[in-house]
Amino acid sequence: LANSGCLRYCPSQTFHDNLVAHDEEVAGADNVKDWNPHLCWSLYRDRKNWPAILQASWVRPEDLHHYDGLFKVVKLATRVHEHPRLVLHAYAQGKYRGNLLDLLEPGFGPAFAPCVLDNTRIPAGFFRRVSSCNAECGSCRYCARVLEKALVRCA
């Protein structure tokens, strides 16, 4: 999924995929009070963990062309997305001017509020850098630096 907001190597991803597939049944069931099955929402409560959003496996609309010739169809997560047309339009156009978090599913806008992740502030070489890095995220800090430049605080 090009716009999956799941954390890299998320241990709950299969569970979440099944949860989304059965969203209607789950929403109608009496669940454990205050239980949140999403590790990511708990992680993003602490701003120091926000760079993880840039370390996840989604692909920006602007970077999809790097996969040309590797597959014929790109799958987008829109089943429970609040604005599926926004997602489809951005990926069909190959560009998006706005809060990158609005394209992801789940949409993490509320977790990052009052900030937005301005997609136009992500550097052009971002894809090449993160797709070829050694994933030493604890010491590299590239994603943290990009995030600080791309975050815009809204009033």
Q: Which stretches of residues belong to each language-model region?
A:
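Active-site pocket-lining/capping segments in soluble small-molecule metabolic enzymes
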Residues: L1-A155
